[in-house]
Amino acid sequence: LKVVIAHGGGYFPHYLGRMDRNHANRPDTVKNTGGRKPSEFLRAFHYDTCVYDPAVLSVLAERVGTDRLVMGSDYPVGEKDPVGWIQGLALPSSDVEKICGGNAARLLGLH
């Protein structure tokens, strides 16, 4: 199963400390994780880039890796130029290429 979470995963990537702490303190409340912490599941998903803040996207890229990010448009309310927004970030060109199409192509089995 391939899952892409909208809006950069929302609060999920930024809430990991709390989830891991609660998991450690109350393992009886978490079932079927195979002993894994919630943060260990983060890279199982893909995330779109509709976060509207370069600092937030930077944290997301650091936590999940740029290979898990796909460009999102958030149509009809999103960035007027979502590709240009990604290109304007302080990312290596190889990461920009992955985010702007390479990752989606891989995710969809197009190459």
Give the label of every model feature segment.
Residues 1-70:
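Catalytic pocket-lining loop regions of alpha/beta-barrel enzymes
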Residues 46-47, 51-70, 76-111:
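Mid-to-C-terminal alpha-helical segments outside catalytic/metal-binding sites
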